[in-house]
Amino acid sequence: MSSYFWAQNESNRPDLLCGQPADYLVEEKHFTTLVCFIVVLGGLLKMCLKNCEVIVLTILSLSGFVIGHMAYNSVEVHQIVYPLLRTSSFSLYSYFSPLIIFMVALDVEFYTLKKMFWQVLLTGLISFSTASIIIGYVVIKFNKDSWDLQSCLLFSITLGIIDPLRSVNSLKTIGISKIYIDLIRGESLIICSIASIFFGNFRGNRIHFSIFRDLHVGIELSYDILGSIIFGYWCAKIIQCILADVFSNMLTNIILCFSMVYMTFYIVEFLGMSGTLALAAVGLNLDSLTFKPKIELVITKFLRIFSSVYEHLIYAFFGIVIGCGELSHYEFHTIPFIFILFTTVNLVRLLTILLVSPILMHSNYEYNWRWGVVITWSGIKGVFNLLWAPDVYNLAERKVEVPQMFILYVQVISLLTMGINSYVMTQSARKLDLCVLSLPRQMILQNATQHIQEIVQNTITLFKTEKILTNVNWTLVEDKTRIEYIPFSHVSHNDMKTESTTDEALMEEARLHVAAIQMSSFEKQRNNGILEIEAARILIGAAKCYYSIQGKFMSIYDVSTYMRTRSWLIKFKNVLTFLEYCIEKIHFIPPESNTFLTFIFHIVFSEEFEYTGQIINLIYIYPMIIHLWPMARGLNVSALISINYYFMFLYVLESTLKIIILKRKYFQQCWNTLEFFILVIGIIDIFCVYFVKLRPDNLALIQLTVIMGYLRIIRFLPLFKIIVPILIRIADVQIKKRLSLMYSITKGYIKSQEDAKLLIKQIAVCESIYQKLCEILETNKQDAVKELVLMEHEGRDVVIALKTKQAIRNVIAKALKNLTFLCSRGIIDKHEVIEINKVLLKKLKALNNFPKAIPPPTPDIYLHNIIWLEGKDVLIDFFKERAKLACFDSGDTICKGGEMPQGIYLIISGMAILHSLSPTFGIESNQRCDRGSRDMFTEFCTTGDIIGELSCLLKREIEYTVICETSLQACFISLEDLYEGFDAFWPSLEYKIWLKLALSTAYQYFESSLIDEDLRFQNCVMFNQAYVETLSSYSDMIIDNMTMKFVIIVYGSVIDTKTEEPYFAPCIIPTTCEQVQGTSDLSKLLIIQASELTQRNSNTNVMASVNTVFEQPGKNINGRQKMS
């Protein structure tokens, strides 16, 4: 293949695609104009004839035919198209096919193809074999041209290829399941790869049918397939590494991506393998997570633009090639033969689907005869058939007189299948109700439409309050923005009336939406830097694998494949730890008079003694090689015997010295036992050699001696002691990597469950479905939380490293965001922004080498992590003097529900389980009549969690019971010490604890409403973005909606003084309420300031800091120190 690709033809005149050679001086400067003309014409036709691509390609083919016929009759036109005619067919294939193959493979869902790989592979093989045999037979039977057998076979292979670009384009716009689109595309990729391998072997080796019986053909095919896949896989890894660089910009990434595609194709072809298969492997191993969000969009657009332009050029070029032939060759029998071929192609496709239907029915519960009908019409031909058509003539054993007939048949058949098959396929899908939305899906769409209408109406209501919009005609606005129904082309209105739905169908549709929300959440977390790319890829892959399993909600146990790997690594490490040789000095006090024992003691427990033993084992390698080599052994028998005696003497000496000192403890170490066993085997070997000298005619004794000689290899086993520590370090690194990965996966899964829970109100079409979904999501979340807590207890150092790394990433991301803000306001010049951006990105890139484990801090350092202490040394020192270390064993009770609190516990290590009824929030049961039986819930507490804050603040009974799941250490601050701190730092300390509890309660219950608010504790303290108000019984508070964006009651209850409507914690008080009155002994309200006021405070601080930095940086720093 490589010789054909690079070498020139043996004759001085190159092979022509078609037409006559030029007998004049050729100038190629006008060919570029022809290419530009075709591109412009194709673009204009595509713009005028939207959704009529087959007509565009037909017009371009006819235009090319006209240009080719003009070239046949005119020297001037022939001079323009001659560069095309002298271009080899493989060159055209190399120019156009790589980008199209890459785009198609990139669009195929890898996880779907992986799950149905054997079904897709069998479908592709059966389709290729059936088409090659039947089409070849029809061509031999009905074609009147004198084609040889090899030409017929190559033509049948060419016509049997299914175009991966056109075969599914018409299905993507009518709502067909993505599974079947990937099935068809996967099949077409396999067929294209097989065809490229066949043509490559024909092109490179000029093989004939007789050679197919030889063994080397099978070896070459294996080399082509495996080599191409492996090369493509590693090229995909290289592209992933290139795109993962944080310093690379969009333009660089796009250029490198396109360059790597072509370079991969050319290198693989040069090595004699299949470039098509290699690029298919590259595209399948890249996914949406490989590219940054904006880059993926741009690359996809570029691929679509180039593939469309290439398609127009291919059809126009081959139209020119056909037109360059003599018209007298196009006889009447050409037309019937074309229709025979068209009918044969579709019948072959029908036979293929009949053969593979049992396989597809077994692999997919949705497959039935209706899908078979639609897939039957998916055998559409396109650009790949055309690109391989000229090779039928070039690789034929016997050259035919009219080579352009191969191209004519393929081009006409491809246009017919594009027009007829595409139309029949889409109409069949519609008539057979395969693209009609199910009733549950239609109900969800209707629910979503209503939700959008509510958002529109709420927006209009909000705009009506703005003074600048008072003179707007709101009636006209409401009329123009009213959404009565969103039309979908694949919605059946009759089914809405006739189809009956069940909870199972609604639940299944909701399950699919939950899976889609989860996958979207995983990708969003990856783009935001929360999830590592490997963790996101595993989660998305697992979600897609379980997506097609009816009734299956993915749990954390379904994605814990790496847990098994991790446990295997732990067991492997435990075995290595057991085998690790460590010298433990025994309590040995040698007698003062016995200097000999003292001398041996120092020898045995010295490092030099161990090194000497290892050196002896290494030196024995050479005599062992001589012993195993028969010729050398025969020449050095006596020398080998003497060396064996010498080494056995050293082994005896080593063991004797150890036994003298260690005595019975000698056999407690496994390596000592092994050495003693080697010593015994060696002594037996010596005796066997000695007895063979005495009885040289004893065959059994000779055989035993030979076996004992080979057993000398076990003398090298102690060398494994050197490798064991290295293997332990490698295993430890891998365990930490797996634990880190699994921790990231679990955190990402929990976040996806929370995201799904926020959106299930739009998914669920009835209350019962909503309750079931909430229950399933909460159960799965609790399971994941339990796994997360166990991992935190199991690998504290790894979890600390992960959390620290994530905190650094969040800080840098915030800095990049603020840098963009300063640049957009013109405060910093763009050049300065680039320099600062490089510094921040360098720090972000340095996180790739961040340690996998960080030792946990000491107990007193954990006080710095208490948020309401704010890291102030005065507060920390105050509580450090009074804090005590409390230790609990597994099963101990830290605190019990109904008891008075003793103080607060800050967990340092370990895990505890909190059992409680749903919290009362300070509301008596007689106050809240709508409160029925309180549900029981479980929460897991681990390192860094605080137990007992609220109970200590209120001095009321604890509402929960906390039991240690593992051994636990906690920093204990007694109730007396806590209130002593309240008195010493009044009132800020108690207020900050209430603020922290109020913020956590608000986020826990109203995260969807507060998602756009920046309610970090430090911001609330510094900028007063949110604050806590206290109401006692019968005390009032006025709500100013101009300054208060949200008023959330987080503890106790209040009533609206105007309507006397009660509000119980936790609850967001509506904006219609103007004044509230406390109805509990103690009520706490979290006030979130309006965005304008908050933004003003924030901007004032930011701009003040900016001005100060530019003007007086030193003064700013001193001022901060005074403030602190």
From Swiss-Prot:
A nucleoside 3',5'-cyclic phosphate binds at residues 867-999. GO terms for biological process: potassium ion transmembrane transport; regulation of intracellular pH; sodium ion import across plasma membrane. It is found in: Membrane. The chain crosses the membrane at residues 25-45, 52-72, 90-110, 120-140, 179-199, 224-244, 254-274, 305-325, 335-355, 372-392, 405-425, 612-632, 641-661, 674-694, 706-726. Pfam families: cNMP_binding, Na_H_Exchanger. Keywords: Antiport, Glycoprotein, Ion transport, Membrane, Sodium, Sodium transport, Transmembrane, Transmembrane helix, Transport. It comes from the Eukaryota. Its main location: membrane. One of its GO terms (cellular component) is plasma membrane. GO terms for molecular function: potassium:proton antiporter activity; sodium:proton antiporter activity. InterPro entries: Cation/H_exchanger_CPA1 (IPR018422), Cation/H_exchanger_TM (IPR006153), cNMP-bd_dom (IPR000595), cNMP-bd_dom_sf (IPR018490), RmlC-like_jellyroll (IPR014710), Volt_channel_dom_sf (IPR027359). PROSITE patterns: CNMP_BINDING_3 (PS50042). The keyword Transmembrane applies. Residues 642-723 are annotated as: Ion transport-like. Glycans are attached at residues 447, 473. It is a multi-pass membrane protein. Involved in pH regulation. Contains an ion transport-like region is related to the membrane segments of voltage-gated ion channels. Belongs to the monovalent cation:proton antiporter 1 (CPA1) transporter (TC 2.A.36) family. This is Sodium/hydrogen exchanger 11. It comes from Homo sapiens. The lineage of its organism: Eukaryota, Metazoa, Chordata, Craniata, Vertebrata. The gene is SLC9C2.
